[in-house]
Amino acid sequence: MARTVIARQYGGIPDLEVADLPSIPLEPGRVRIAVKAAAVNPADLKRLRGEFGRNEKSLPLRLGSEVSGVVTEVSPDAVGPAGAIAVGDEVVGYPVSGGFAAELIAKAESVLPKPPGLGWPEAAGLLLGAVTAFHLVEVAGIAAGDRVIVHGATGAVGSAALQLARLRGAEVFGTVREGREAAVTAFGAVPVPYGPGLEQRLRALLPEGADAALDTVGSDEALDASVALVHDRNRVVTVAGFARAAELGIRLLGSGPGADPGTELRANARLPMLQLAGEGKLIGPPVIEFPLDRVQEALTLVAGGHAGGKVVLLP
C-alpha cells in the first residue's frame, strides 16, 4: 500500500484526500520510485478543475508531474534518457503522472539522474520551470550582448529564464514585486518594479529599447510594455496571457490555443538543465515544504499566485 493524494471527482481543493492505494505490478518500460519530494504547480490545479479535459473513467484523479526519489524496481527493458536505470538510483521524474504519493510508477523516458549536490525538494521542483525557461530563451534567440526584459523574474520560470539569459551573456532587466528586488540582483540582473508606469521605468533604463522580452506573467502591463520596447515582435515570447498576446502578435509557448508546445525541445533540455543545476549554475527558487497530508494547504498557497517559492510535498 502507498499513501497517495487522490480526488474522486473533478472539482476543487476540498476534493483532495490522502488514501492508501495498493501497489501494482510494473509494465514494460516502467520504473518504480519511492518518492522523496513532489513539486506542486498551477497545472495541478487546472487538472483538478478539469481544465485540461475530463475523463470520468480515469477517476480517482491523481496529481503531480515532478518528483525526486529512489528507484526501487525496474522492468527489464527500462532505459532512461541518460542510459540504464538501476535499483537504488537517486532520480528526478519529469514529466510523470500521480507524483503526489509515497510511491510512483513512471515511464523510463521520464526518469533522469538527480545531481548529487541537489537536495530532494530542490530536485523535485527544478525541471518544469527550467525547461519552460529554456524554451523561452531558445525561441527568443537570446545571445551575448542582448538587452532582455524578463517579466516575473522571481518566479520558478522567470528566475530560470533570467539565469539562462545571463549565462548566454545577455544584459537582463527583471520585473518584480516591490520587496523582491534582491532575488533579481543576486543573479546579476537589474530589478524593475511592477505597477503603473512600468513601460516608462523600463524605457528610462533602456532608452534605445530592448532586443527581446520573455514573459511569464501575461498581464496587459507586461505585454504592452514588451511590445513598446522590443523592435522585433518575433523576439517577444510568452507562456501566459494568451488572449492578449494573440491580439498583439506575440509568440505563444506552451499548451494554450495556437501555442508552440516545444515538446521535443523541452524533453531534450532536461539533462542539460540538471547538469547546470548540479554545477551550481542554475539555482531554483526557495522551497516551501508541506507534508503530504497537508496537500490542501499546499495547493491553496499555489492557487494564491504569490507563494514566494516552489511548493513541495514530502510523502
Residues covered by each model-derived region:
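C-terminal capping/lid region of NAD(P)-dependent oxidoreductase domains
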Residues: 281-285, 299-315
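N-terminal Rossmann-like NAD(P) cofactor-binding module of classical short-chain dehydrogenase/reductase
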Residues: 92, 213-214, 237
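Short amphipathic alpha-helix with an adjacent loop that forms part of the alpha/beta core around
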Residues: 198-208
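NAD(P)H dinucleotide-binding glycine-rich loop of Rossmann-like/cofactor-binding domains
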Residues: 46, 65, 78, 90-152
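Mid-domain Rossmann-like dinucleotide-binding core that forms the NAD(H)/NADP(H) cofactor-binding site
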Residues: 130-195
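Glycine-rich beta-strand-centered segment in the early N-terminal region that forms part
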Residues: 22-39, 52-97
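Glycine-rich phosphate-binding loop and adjacent beta-alpha segment
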Residues: 220-282, 292, 315
